[in-house]
């Protein structure tokens, strides 16, 4: 499945020919290189290992340097992602935005903004307690335990805690515009993550559903 490693630049808006304003997210792509391949014969499935954004020399270990010695004029990469089912490229090839011309919808994966420690109402959208004067609690989450049996709170119970900073995928985002000169695409709607965070852009899996 076709995919690239990009960077979220931010949001803006564009006007369609009929005058409708569309909110879009700008995704910018540094050069994506194929740094490895997996084949059905050797690994049991076909895949390409893609890398993007050069890594500083001081942060590159010897084993990693050894892997890149086989690749000519390609520096070690900070972000390395495996895309299954993708063929037609060899190690060392640069993958451009050309394939996006044939794709209308994409799935984008990123890391959500970290919100820190938050209460149950903000974190899980709980209703809270009565807001009137006589109530003893207003933003409490309510009971979390059981009776004598099992006499414990189950793992995974929705409670207050650290919010955000999780991997999230938004599906079926429409590609509004492709700017090959600036190596960027505009997609309709919001994308998880802060400005400058890296995202994975793949061809949509569930188009038409």
From Swiss-Prot:
<dbReference type="GO" id="GO:0022625">
    <property type="term" value="C:cytosolic large ribosomal subunit"/>
</dbReference>
<dbReference type="InterPro" id="IPR019926">
    <property type="entry name" value="Ribosomal_uL3_CS"/>
</dbReference>
<comment type="function">
    <text>One of the primary rRNA binding proteins, it binds directly near the 3'-end of the 23S rRNA, where it nucleates assembly of the 50S subunit.</text>
</comment>
<keyword id="KW-0694">RNA-binding</keyword>
<comment type="similarity">
    <text>Belongs to the universal ribosomal protein uL3 family.</text>
</comment>
<protein>
    <recommendedName>
        <fullName>Large ribosomal subunit protein uL3</fullName>
    </recommendedName>
</protein>
<dbReference type="GO" id="GO:0019843">
    <property type="term" value="F:rRNA binding"/>
</dbReference>
<feature type="region of interest" description="Disordered">
    <location>
        <begin position="127"/>
        <end position="151"/>
    </location>
</feature>
<keyword id="KW-0687">Ribonucleoprotein</keyword>
<dbReference type="Pfam" id="PF00297">
    <property type="entry name" value="Ribosomal_L3"/>
</dbReference>
<dbReference type="GO" id="GO:0003735">
    <property type="term" value="F:structural constituent of ribosome"/>
</dbReference>
<keyword id="KW-0699">rRNA-binding</keyword>
<dbReference type="GO" id="GO:0006412">
    <property type="term" value="P:translation"/>
</dbReference>
<dbReference type="InterPro" id="IPR019927">
    <property type="entry name" value="Ribosomal_uL3_bac/org-type"/>
</dbReference>
<dbReference type="InterPro" id="IPR009000">
    <property type="entry name" value="Transl_B-barrel_sf"/>
</dbReference>
<dbReference type="InterPro" id="IPR000597">
    <property type="entry name" value="Ribosomal_uL3"/>
</dbReference>
<keyword id="KW-0689">Ribosomal protein</keyword>
<comment type="subunit">
    <text>Part of the 50S ribosomal subunit. Forms a cluster with proteins L14 and L19.</text>
</comment>
